[in-house]
From Swiss-Prot:
[4Fe-4S] cluster binds at residues 58, 62, 65. Binds 1 [4Fe-4S] cluster. The cluster is coordinated with 3 cysteines and an exchangeable S-adenosyl-L-methionine. Binds 1 [2Fe-2S] cluster. The cluster is coordinated with 3 cysteines and 1 arginine. Catalyzes the conversion of dethiobiotin (DTB) to biotin by the insertion of a sulfur atom into dethiobiotin via a radical-based mechanism. Belongs to the radical SAM superfamily. Biotin synthase family. This is Biotin synthase. Pathway: Cofactor biosynthesis; biotin biosynthesis; biotin from 7,8-diaminononanoate: step 2/2. It comes from Caulobacter vibrioides (strain NA1000 / CB15N) (Caulobacter crescentus). The lineage of its organism: Bacteria, Pseudomonadati, Pseudomonadota, Alphaproteobacteria, Caulobacterales.
Length: 341
């Protein structure tokens, strides 16, 4: 394996990424922390909120997702929210300390008929002074350009897992289709938000495969969310994890964060779904290993996040501060409810 440096590379081999995972834990975290400090203030954490603007009824069969129409999870499908309601949630998120506001819709792909309403939402949220992000399923090249023109800064489209395990997660969308959407986003001039989920029954080689894919993209993701599976009853992967009682090992989760930081040194590595189930000590280790972004707001889709008081106390105890330093960790009581990327 080549010497670990803080300089971005796009020529990582899968063997090199696997070798990073195999480093002694203390050495891996040390190297990741060094890379992190070369590009970021380790005491600064970015705060984001992600609102579900259209929940449930998705045609995809992603085996972890409560929003899939293929599974009976008790989730009620809703129509696309009105722009005024979305803007009100965004304003509350901004006033509560969020720097980025993400809008998510449970669609396989964006339909042109929904573009006018979405571009209106994006423009009005942008006018609040927030960074804007959306996750709306697959995009065409023209749709990506329209979203960019409306003021969208970031587009989220996760790879979910490594290519070899992907068929065990979803069969209604190909890996290449995900890569194609990311290419449309880049070509339109938007920043990419792309990561995956761990704890779905995959092996370490699959986690390495995911990070290898991300590290060898033409441009590293600007934001790299790492989600820990929150098993939801009624979903195939959730039921499997619940029945077997097997969650990803906490140390292995930190390893994943550390490797992500090393192979994508300038990306914002985000602790996403699953943070509610993490101890304070585990979150601290993740921050030490290079995570520097979290979701706030109390809820991610159908799964909980730590409350405002918990996050405020965690930041105080770890001497952390919101990125930019001008916003509060505490969210107001009416802060927007948020949904998972």
């Amino acid at each position: 394996m080549s010497e670990i440096t803080a300089s971005p590379r796009h020529d990582w081999t899968l063997a090199e990424v696997e070798a990073l995972f195999a480093l002694p834990f203390m050495e891996l975290v040390f190297q990741a922390a060094n890379v992190h400090r070369a590009h970021f203030d380790p005491s600064e954490i970015q705060l984001s909120q992600l609102l579900s603007v259209k929940t449930g009824g998705c045609a995809e069969n992603c085996g972890y997702c409560s929003q899939s129409a293929h599974f009976k999870t008790g989730l009620k499908a809703d129509k696309l929210m009105a722009a005024d309601d979305v803007v009100a949630k965004a304003r509350a998120a901004r006033d509560g300390g969020a720097q980025r506001f993400c809008m998510g819709a449970a669609w396989r792909e964006l339909k042109d008929r929904d573009l006018p309403k979405l571009t209106e939402m994006i423009g009005e949220v942008k006018a609040l002074g927030l960074e804007t992000c959306a996750t709306l399923g697959m995009l065409t090249a023209d749709q990506a350009k329209a979203l960019k023109a409306a003021g969208l800064d970031y587009y989220n489209h996760n790879l979910d897992t490594g290519p070899d395990y992907y068929k065990d997660v979803v069969t209604t969308r190909t890996y290449q289709e995900r890569l194609d959407t990311l290419a449309h986003v880049r070509d339109a001039g938007m920043s990419t938000c792309c990561g995956g989920i761990v704890g779905m029954g995959e092996q370490r080689r699959d986690r390495a495969g995911l990070l290898h894919q991300l590290a060898t993209l033409p441009a590293h993701p600007d934001s790299l969310p790492i989600n820990g599976l929150v098993p939801i009853s009624g979903t195939p992967l959730g039921d499997k994890v619940l029945s077997e009682g097997k969650a990803i090992d906490a140390i292995e989760f930190v390893r994943t964060i550390a490797v992500a930081r090393i192979v994508c040194p300038k990306s914002m590595v985000r602790l996403s779904a699953g943070r509610e189930g993490m101890s304070r000590e585990l979150q601290a280790l993740c921050f030490m290993a290079g995570a520097n972004s979290i979701f706030v707001g109390g809820k991610l889709l159908t799964t909980p996040l730590p409350g405002q008081d918990e996050d405020s106390q965690l930041f105080q105890d770890l001497d952390l501060k919101p990125m930019g330093g001008a916003v509060r960790v505490e969210a107001k009581a009416d802060a927007a409810m948020v949904a998972a990327e």
